[in-house]
């Protein structure tokens, strides 16, 4: 991965060249992309970025990375948006030029491959594989080569156009280059016949226009570079683009898309303040005529030709060639003659819509178009055969002579191939007029006679069955009222005539009787019944009086009618504007819905393509694994697998085949080894039986050979050792002369090294002593600083301790005062309790005395023999069960009944606490009361005798 973070824009090109040189084109492209997308690039000058972006575009095209280049162009547009947005134009042109050049190169390569395949072997016959491929596929070798070589670059070029249009859209400063790219995209679709891409391109342009013209809360924010459709030049550019779109749609024969383009052009024409160019409008009407002709709408087809002729007739004299004028005039008259008689009875809403597209005030009719053409003296400009056809059909039409008159005319028209689309509708018109005229003359005729009259030379020829079918269809549509009697072989004409507007040959007898009175009135009105001058004078005076009386009324009616006409016209105009606005809204909504549907469809297609891509990748991986495994198996030589016939096999099957083959070969090898071992065993046994007699002789010979070899090797070793020893002795003698010089040089070196060592050791000892002294000084200074810091801390601790002791003493004094106060309160309560006990004792003594007296009285009564008091008499409280018992008598065993039943006891005499108040300092177990810190055990001040100890000094 290339380093992206710290690369400056000025060094990017150099780094890119280095990466490309080592074959890392993808890393180089990523480096360029991140350079353009980095935040630092926004502050870089455009002149510095231009070569980087140019290299980025070139490398993206080479690697065919459409998505990366689209994002890069968007980032570059953001950079140059505020400074010089036109700087993006050369980048766009370079991008499209490179992409188009790649397509051209791919086409040349495909042609070269096709030529090589064709010229590979001129005498070779077709192989069975070629025959099978030709059978199952309709493509030839050239088509397959194009799909493999050219199609990927075509797809890349199409994506390039889409990406560029997305970058350039809705920017007023880029309108010109936007229009140029659209024209290039149109030429691309036309050159390569890309009909699907052309439809998508048209939808893309409509969505761009819709976004530009959108208003309301959902509209994009208006900026300084937003496109303004109210500008005449901008609208003219959009009109030019739509005219080009219409031309390409017609050339590609995409009639539905062409009609939608016509609607786009008409919508822009309605909002344009500048009239369109006559040449463009002429092209518009001619394309519209072709669309209507393909759709079979001959009425509006003729109306479009009529508008084109009207446009040409307004051109300056000599501006239009005579041949072109004659061609258009001939098409105008011929298309008007080919209009069926019932064409005006079609859908009214559709006719209104098509009328608006032709900029007509009212729905055209056949008669109106013919009158309009004749009013411009069109017969003087049309071809002679068309003029003769008009006179035959509209002026001199007669059912009995029509065949003879049309034969030479039809032959002349049939020679012109451009008139071929009008043969069928003209024949329908001729038959309709023929049967209408026959119905005015005859009540019944022979069927053979009718078929003879309706049979014309080619291209107007028809079979009798086709003629009968035409009659049936015309009757079903209400054009004719005819019955065919096949038994009598006759044709019966009804009396009802279709209101076709065609001229009548003569009136029927019924018509003569019905119109007799009206004809008589018209005849009498022509005759002058008043012959005298007096009568004529009276008539004149009466007429003058009537005229004077009616003049004012007629004038008022005229004004009222004019006002009503103006009101209706204004209402119609308002309704038309409202209708157009509603249609525009519906059209915009429809475009939005279609755009959403298209986005959903594209997303679904993208998802499907992604799934298909994943599936293909998985299949490719499996195929690669199968192929690799098959190659490994073939390399091992276990079995031989044809790499071209791996269909239906997977890796498990290949491994199973390998294992089965190994098992089979192992079994076969074992069988062969057993047979071979048995055979070798017998052979070896026979060999050894034969070798026994030869072994002793061979042993003696072997000993002799070994001795000879041993003696030879010993002699060689001795000779070699002696030669080496002599060479070393000679070398020692030669080196002995250099020993004194060696010793002298060694001693000199040793003396120098010892002196250097002594010097370095002394320097090291000196440096060590200096470092030691510095270290000692540093330690002393540190210890002094530590002592000062410890002294300051001790002083601070002493101050804190003194402060804490003072606080503890004050707290102890407060606690002592609290204890004294509590003791005083206790003493007061005890004295009060003592007084209460004394009062109680005195009361008890009184009660005892009273009780004694009562006892004495009772004893006296009983001794005197008086009756005892009733059982319900008075009993003192002390003797009642559950009665009151003084506190002093409660609790002992000999207490009176009711003792211990809950009588009152002073809190100070209660046992176990009894609920009496006990000071917190005397409570056992803490009791939850307050205990001074000096008396707490295990507290933070334990062992300090109540003195406060700071937390830092506690153990």
From Swiss-Prot:
Entry-linked Gene3D superfamilies: 1.25.40.860, UVR domain (4.10.860.10)
Q: Coiled-coil ranges per the record? A: 96-127, 533-636, 752-860
Q: Name one GO molecular function term.
A: mRNA binding
The biological process GO terms on file are: formation of cytoplasmic translation initiation complex; translation reinitiation
The residues covered by the PCI domain are: 325-498
Tree of life domain: Eukaryota
Q: What cellular component GO annotations does this protein have?
A: cytoplasmic stress granule; eukaryotic 43S preinitiation complex; eukaryotic 48S preinitiation complex; eukaryotic translation initiation factor 3 complex, eIF3e; eukaryotic translation initiation factor 3 complex, eIF3m; multi-eIF complex
Q: Where in the cell is it found?
A: Cytoplasm
Q: Basic and acidic residues bias: where?
A: 789-858
The principal localisation class reads: cytoplasm
For this protein, the record's SMART domains field holds:
PINT
Region: Disordered, residue numbers: 789-955
> What protein family does this chain belong to?
Belongs to the eIF-3 subunit A family.
- Quaternary structure per UniProt? Component of the eukaryotic translation initiation factor 3 (eIF-3) complex.
Q: What is the purpose of this protein?
A: RNA-binding component of the eukaryotic translation initiation factor 3 (eIF-3) complex, which is involved in protein synthesis of a specialized repertoire of mRNAs and, together with other initiation factors, stimulates binding of mRNA and methionyl-tRNAi to the 40S ribosome. The eIF-3 complex specifically targets and initiates translation of a subset of mRNAs involved in cell proliferation.
Name by which UniProt lists this protein: Eukaryotic translation initiation factor 3 subunit A
Q: Which organism is it from?
A: Yarrowia lipolytica (strain CLIB 122 / E 150)
Q: What is the lineage of its organism?
A: Eukaryota, Fungi, Dikarya, Ascomycota, Saccharomycotina
- Identify the coding gene: TIF32
């Amino acid at each position: 991965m290339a380093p992206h973070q710290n690369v400056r824009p000025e060094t990017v090109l150099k780094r890119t060249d280095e990466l490309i040189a080592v074959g890392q084109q993808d890393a180089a492209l990523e480096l360029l992309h991140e350079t353009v997308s980095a935040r630092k690039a926004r502050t870089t000058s455009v002149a510095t970025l231009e070569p980087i972006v140019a290299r980025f575009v070139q490398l993206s095209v080479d690697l065919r990375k459409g998505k990366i280049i689209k994002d890069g162009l968007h980032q570059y547009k953001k950079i140059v948006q505020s400074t010089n947005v036109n700087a993006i134009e050369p980048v766009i042109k370079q991008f499209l030029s490179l992409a188009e050049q790649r397509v051209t190169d791919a086409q040349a390569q495909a042609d070269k491959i096709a030529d090589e395949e064709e010229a590979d072997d001129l005498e070779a016959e077709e192989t069975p594989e070629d025959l099978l491929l030709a059978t199952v596929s309709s493509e030839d070798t050239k088509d397959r080569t194009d799909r493999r070589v050219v199609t990927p670059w075509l797809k890349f070029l199409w994506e390039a156009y889409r990406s560029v249009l997305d970058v350039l859209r809705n920017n007023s400063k880029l309108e010109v280059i936007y229009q140029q790219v659209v024209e290039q995209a149109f030429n691309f679709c036309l050159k390569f016949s890309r009909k699907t891409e052309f439809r998508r391109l048209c939808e893309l342009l409509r969505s761009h226009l819709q976004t530009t013209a959108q208003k309301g809360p959902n509209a994009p924010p208006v900026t300084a570079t937003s496109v303004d459709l109210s500008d005449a030049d901008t609208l003219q550019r959009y009109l030019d683009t739509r005219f080009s779109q219409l031309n390409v749609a017609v050339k590609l024969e995409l009639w539905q898309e062409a009609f939608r383009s016509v609607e786009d052009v008409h919508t822009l024409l309605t909002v344009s303040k500048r009239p369109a160019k006559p040449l463009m409008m002429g092209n518009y009407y001619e394309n519209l005529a072709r669309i209507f002709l393909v759709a079979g709408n001959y009425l509006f087809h003729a109306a479009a030709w009529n508008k084109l002729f009207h446009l040409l007739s307004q051109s300056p004299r000599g501006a239009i060639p005579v041949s072109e004028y004659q061609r258009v005039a001939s098409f105008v008259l011929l298309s008007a003659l080919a209009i069926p008689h019932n064409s005006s009875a079609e859908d009214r809403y559709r006719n209104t819509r098509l009328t608006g597209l032709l900029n007509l005030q009212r729905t055209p009719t056949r008669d109106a178009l013919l009158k309009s053409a004749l009013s411009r003296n069109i017969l003087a400009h049309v071809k002679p055969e068309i003029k003769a056809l008009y006179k035959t059909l509209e002026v001199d039409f007669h059912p009995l002579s029509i065949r003879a008159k049309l034969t030479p005319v039809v032959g002349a028209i049939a020679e012109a191939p451009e008139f071929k689309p009008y043969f069928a509708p003209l024949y329908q018109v001729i038959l309709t007029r023929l049967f209408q005229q026959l119905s005015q003359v005859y009540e019944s005729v022979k069927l053979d006679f009718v078929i003879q009259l309706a049979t014309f030379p080619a291209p107007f020829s028809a079979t009798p069955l086709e003629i009968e079918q035409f009659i049936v269809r015309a009757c079903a549509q209400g054009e004719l009222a005819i019955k065919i009697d096949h038994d009598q072989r006759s044709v019966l004409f009804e009396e009802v005539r279709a209101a076709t507007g065609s001229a009548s040959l003569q009136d029927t007898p019924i018509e003569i009787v019905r119109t007799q009175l009206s004809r008589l009135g018209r005849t009498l009105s022509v005759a002058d019944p008043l012959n005298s001058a007096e009568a004529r004078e009276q008539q004149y005076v009466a007429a003058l009086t009537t005229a004077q009386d009616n003049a004012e009324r007629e004038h008022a009616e005229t004004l009222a009618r004019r006002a009503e006409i103006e009101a209706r016209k204004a209402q119609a105009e308002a309704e038309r504007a409202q209708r157009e606005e509603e249609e525009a809204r519906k059209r915009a909504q429809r475009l939005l819905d279609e755009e959403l549907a298209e986005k959903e469809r594209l997303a679904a297609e993208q998802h499907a393509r992604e799934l298909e891509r994943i599936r293909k990748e998985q299949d490719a991986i499996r195929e690669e694994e199968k192929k690799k495994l098959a190659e490994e198996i073939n390399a091992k030589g276990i079995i031989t697998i044809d790499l071209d016939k791996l269909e239906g096999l997977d890796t498990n099957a290949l491994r199973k085949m390998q294992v089965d083959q190994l098992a089979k070969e192992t079994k076969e090898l074992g069988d062969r080894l057993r047979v071979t071992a048995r055979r070798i065993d017998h052979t070896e046994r026979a060999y050894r039986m034969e070798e026994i007699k030869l072994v002793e002789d061979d042993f003696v010979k072997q000993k002799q050979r070994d001795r000879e070899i041993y003696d030879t090797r010993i002699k060689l070793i001795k000779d070699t050792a002696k030669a080496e020893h002599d060479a070393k002795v000679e070398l020692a003698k030669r080196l002995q002369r250099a020993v004194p010089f060696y010793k002298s040089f060694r001693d000199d070196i040793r003396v120098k090294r010892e002196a250097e060592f002594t010097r370095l050791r002394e320097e090291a000892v000196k440096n060590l002593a200096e470092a030691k002294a510095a270290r000692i000084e540093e330690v002393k200074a540190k210890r002094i600083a530590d002592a000062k810091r410890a002294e300051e801390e001790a002083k601070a601790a002493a101050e804190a301790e003194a402060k804490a002791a003072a606080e503890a003493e004050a707290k102890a004094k407060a606690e002592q005062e609290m204890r004294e106060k509590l003791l005083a309160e206790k003493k007061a309560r005890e004295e009060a309790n003592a007084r209460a006990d004394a009062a109680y004792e005195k009361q008890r003594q009184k009660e005892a005395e009273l009780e004694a007296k009562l006892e004495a009285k009772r004893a006296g009564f009983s001794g005197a023999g008086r009756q005892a008091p009733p059982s319900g008499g008075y009993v003192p409280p002390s003797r009642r069960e559950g009665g009151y018992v003084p506190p002093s008598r409660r609790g002992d065993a000999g207490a009176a009944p009711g003792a211990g039943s809950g009588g009152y006891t002073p809190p100070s005499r209660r046992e176990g606490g009894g609920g009496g108040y006990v000071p917190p300092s005397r409570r056992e177990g803490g009791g939850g009361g307050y205990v001074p810190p000096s008396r707490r055990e295990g507290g933070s001040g334990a062992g300090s005798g109540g003195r406060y100890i700071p937390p830092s000094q506690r153990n």
